[in-house]
Amino acid sequence: MEDLCKIRDVYRAIAEFETQFIQQYNLSLNEGMLLCALLDNPRLTSGEIAEALGLTHSNTSKLIRSVEEKKLIARIIGKVDKRQMYFSLTAEGKEQIHTIKTVSYTHLTLPTNRL
């Protein structure tokens, strides 16, 4: 039972961190992780994004749409197969993820003392 309580505390800590992250960057953790994935791999399909983030295809589609609406990623049509769709960071998306990666997160609370 003690392990279950620790898992609950980890879940709460992540939820608190995400709330602060959203306030700071106007991005959910999944949106931030999508930007990180595209920084590491500049051209990914929606299926590759789903696999990289461990999301269902349905959730990935919603996530992509949300980040596209924020103009942080762009669609690229495949050169060989015009039916193939790739996603990459826009200049604004690159700027955003570099800001996120270089900022110190000491101001965002992750209450590890409960773990």
Residue spans of the language-model regions?
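Conserved small/polar residues in nucleotide/adenosyl-binding loops
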Residues: T106-T112
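N-terminal helix-turn-helix DNA-binding core of bacterial DNA-binding proteins
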Residues: F17-S58
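Canonical helix-turn-helix DNA-binding module
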Residues: P42-Y86
